[in-house]
Amino acid sequence: MQVIKRDGEIAEFNPDKIYQAILKAAQTVYVLTDDLRQNLAQVTKKVVLDLEEAKVERATISMIQSMVEHRLLGAGYITIAEHYISYRL
């Protein structure tokens, strides 16, 4: 799968970038424990599954970010989702 970046450049999809962005948002609010890291890794995996189910060849950054927000909120990480949203703006 490929990603269409904000500047229009096409890049290979890298799930670790999603995970790192979520961690950055989380560490503004919480101390990153192993349990929290594992839970956020599961959120990342669910986003990857959502993307695979969407069957798009080239996902946009905004599509991926919306999926991340949805999964964070669904997992009860409301504060992390708020910081993730502000981080991406």
Predicted features along the sequence, with ranges:
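Long, C-terminal-biased catalytic regions of enzyme "large/alpha" subunits
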Residues: 1-89
